[in-house]
Design a protein with these regions (language model features):
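A glycine- and small-residue-enriched flexible loop/hinge signal that marks low-structured segments
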Residues: 2-59, 66-106, 123, 128, ...
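Compositionally biased, low-complexity/repeat regions
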Residues: 93, 103-111, 115, 157, ...
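Surface-exposed beta-strand/loop patches in extracellular or lumenal glycoproteins
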Residues: 110-129
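Short loop/turn motifs at secondary-structure junctions
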Residues: 131, 218-219, 441-443
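Surface-exposed interaction regions enriched in Ser/Thr/Asp/Glu
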Residues: 136-137, 141-191
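Short, ordered beta-strand-loop transition motifs
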Residues: 151-160, 258-259, 292-294, 454-462
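Sequence/fold signature of self-assembling virion shell proteins
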Residues: 274-277, 299, 304-307, 427-449, ...
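Acidic, low-complexity glycine/serine/threonine-rich segments
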Residues: 388-452
C-alpha cells in the first residue's frame, strides 16, 4: 500500500511474480463460413447475416441459426453443426452465415397446387419452397385473386397454405400461386470469400475471421467453409486468411477436393493432379478426398476431420500434439456423388490410400478397426518436407504454442526493457517446456535470449528477440521390423 509523509511502523509492498503461468488457449476453435436457414427462425428473432456467432452446443446453434430438416444438404453450416456437435461432441464453433433471405431470393410466377392432397388435412396445401413473401393466390384459370386472411392463411417459414372454411376457395380446389422465396442457391463463392465494404468498413464472409478474437477472446485454429471449399478460389483464400489473423495468429484450413457435381474427381489417381493444378499446396492447408456418408447424409471429409481433430485434442489434454490420422470416423461409407446424383462407394486399399498420403492428401482407410482418417500431411507435402510445415500435428502444435506465447506475455508489452523482464520470459517458458517434456507432450524445448540475435540498434528501439527451440513428437507413420530366420536355434533339435 502506498503511503506518503512521515512513516512510523511496519509497511509492506508487493512485486510482480517473476514467473508467469501460461495463458489457456483452446486448440480446436473452428471458424466456419457458409449458409444456414435463418429464414426458418421465428419472426421476432434476429437473423444473423455476416455476424460471427459463437456456439458450444447443438441446441444453441440451432436456436440461433435455424434448422431445415427437409433440406439439410442445402445449407452448408447445418452439415458442420450436426457433425461437430452431435457426432464428435466438439466445441467451440464460430459460425458466419452469408445467406441473406432479403438478398438471395427468387420469384415463382405460376405454381399450381391443390388443397386436400394431404391425408392429414383436406384444407392444407404446401408451396414448393419455404421462406416466402408476397404470396398471391388465384383460381385455376387465373381470373380470381384470393385474399389472404379471408380465403387462406400462409405460414411464411414453411410455405404451408391453409384454406379457410369461410373463404371462397372451394374444398379440394386447385389454385395458382405466385410468390418470392428465400433461395439459398443464389449464394456464391464470392459471398463466402467476402471482403470489406468500402462505405461502411464492415467485413463479410471469411474476412470476419479477424473479429473472432476481439469478440470472443478465442483464437481461431481451424477454418472451414463446408461445400464451398470445393471451389479452389475459396480454398486459396481460406489458406490466405489463416496466416496473420489479427496480425498475430495462425490457423489451418481444411478443404475438400470436389467429389460431386460437374467437377467431381472420382478416381484416386486423378486427385494429386487436381491438387497441383489448382494450387492447393499451402503450408496451412489440409486437403481431403473423397466425401463421406452417415445414414442418408453426405458430408465433406474436411467437416468430419475437424471433428476428429477436436476429439483427438480432447483426448490429449486439449493440446494438439497428436495426429488426427488413423482415428475413427463416425461414418458408414466413403465415396462420391455421380452425375446421376447417386452415391457411389469407394473402397481404397492401403496402397492407394498411402499413395494419396504421399501426395499430401487426407483420405479414408478401412484397413483395420473400421473407417478411419488416413493422412498426417499438410498440403505443402511433398514439395515441402520441413517437419513444422509438412506434419499436421507439428504444424498445429506450433500454431497453438505461438498463440499461447503471445497471449501469456502480451501484458508485458511496453514494460521497461530490463534484465528482470528478460528473466521473466526465460524462467516462465523453460519451466513450462520442462513440464511438457516430462509429460511427453514435447520431446524437449528451450528458450534463449541471445546477444547475437539482439543487436544494440534493436535494443535501444525497444525490440527484444527470444529464440525458442521445441520438439513436439513426430507421428510414427512408418514402423518397421526386420525378421530373420536364425539357424543357430536349430541346435535345440539335439537337446
Amino acid at each position: 500500500m502506498a503511503t506518503t509523509g512521515y512513516r512510523h511502523g511496519i509497511y509492506t509492498s508487493e512485486q510482480a511474480t517473476s514467473i508467469l503461468p501460461a495463458r489457456t488457449v483452446d486448440s480446436a476453435v473452428v471458424f466456419a463460413v457458409g449458409t444456414a436457414p435463418v429464414h426458418t427462425l421465428a419472426g421476432d428473432k434476429a437473423r444473423p447475416v455476416n455476424v460471427p456467432q459463437l456456439f458450444y452446443s447443438y441446441d444453441e446453434a440451432v436456436q440461433a441459426m435455424g434448422w431445415d430438416a427437409d433440406h439439410c444438404s442445402d445449407y452448408s453450416l447445418q452439415e458442420l453443426i450436426y457433425s461437430h456437435f452431435a457426432i464428435y461432441r466438439g466445441a467451440p464453433v464460430v459460425c458466419v452465415n452469408v445467406f441473406d433471405p432479403e438478398k438471395h431470393k427468387s420469384e415463382v410466377a405460376d405454381e399450381s397446387l391443390t388443397f386436400g392432397t394431404s391425408v392429414l388435412d383436406k384444407d392444407i396445401a404446401r408451396l414448393a419452397h419455404g421462406g416466402v413473401c408476397a404470396v398471391e393466390l388465384k383460381d385455376e384459370l387465373g381470373e380470381t385473386t384470393y385474399e389472404a386472411g379471408t380465403d387462406y392463411s400462409v405460414d411464411a417459414v414453411s410455405g404451408l397454405l391453409t384454406r379457410l372454411a369461410e373463404g371462397s376457395i372451394p374444398e379440394g380446389g386447385t389454385v395458382k400461386a405466385g410468390y418470392v422465396y428465400a433461395d439459398v442457391s443464389k449464394v456464391t463463392s464470392e459471398d463466402v470469400i467476402g471482403g470489406i465494404d468500402p462505405a461502411s468498413g464492415q467485413g463479410t464472409g471469411l474476412e470476419l475471421i479477424d473479429e473472432v478474437f476481439p469478440r470472443f477472446r478465442l483464437v481461431p485454429s481451424i477454418v472451414l467453409a463446408p461445400q464451398f471449399c470445393e471451389d479452389p478460389a475459396v480454398a486459396v483464400v481460406m489458406a490466405a486468411k489463416c496466416d496473420g489473423i489479427n496480425g498475430l495468429f495462425q490457423a489451418i484450413c481444411l478443404v475438400d477436393i470436389p467429389s460431386s457435381g460437374d467437377n467431381a474427381v472420382t478416381k484416386y489417381s486423378d486427385v494429386p493432379g487436381y491438387k497441383e493444378k489448382h494450387n492447393l499446396t499451402d503450408g496451412l492447408m489440409v486437403v481431403c478426398w473423397p466425401k463421406v456418408k452417415l445414414g442418408d447424409n453426405v458430408y465433406g471429409l474436411a467437416t468430419h476431420l475437424a471433428g476428429v481433430m477436436a476429439a483427438t485434442d480432447g483426448d490429449h489434454d486439449g493440446i494438439p500434439y497428436a495426429s488426427p490420422s488413423n482415428k475413427r470416423l463416425d461414418i458408414t461409407s466413403s465415396g462420391y456423388v455421380g452425375a446421376d446424383g447417386q452415391w457411389n462407394e469407394l473402397w481404397l486399399d492401403l496402397t492407394k490410400a498411402n499413395y494419396l498420403n504421399g501426395q499430401g492428401i487426407y483420405t479414408v482407410s478401412n484397413f483395420d478397426g473400421g473407417m478411419k482418417t488416413w493422412g498426417g500431411r499438410m498440403a505443402c507435402y511433398p514439395s515441402n518436407t520441413d517437419p513444422k510445415d509438412a506434419q499436421d500435428s507439428i504444424r498445429r502444435f506450433f500454431n497453438w504454442y505461438q498463440a499461447q506465447f503471445i497471449l501469456t506475455y502480451f501484458a508485458k508489452v511496453d514494460e521497461p526493457l530490463t534484465r528482470r523482464l528478460g528473466q521473466t520470459f526465460l524462467k516462465s517458458e523453460q519451466i513450462k517446456l520442462d513440464g511438457y517434456a516430462a509429460r511427453e507432450i514435447c520431446l524437449g524445448g528451450s528458450i534463449t535470449f541471445d546477444e547475437s540475435e539482439n543487436p544494440v540498434t534493436d535494443l535501444i528501439d525497444g525490440i527484444m528477440r527470444f529464440h525458442l527451440r521445441i520438439t513436439p513428437p513426430p507421428a510414427a507413420r512408418d514402423i518397421e521390423a526386420v525378421f530373420e530366420f536364425d539357424t543357430d536355434n536349430l541346435s535345440a533339435l539335439f537337446g
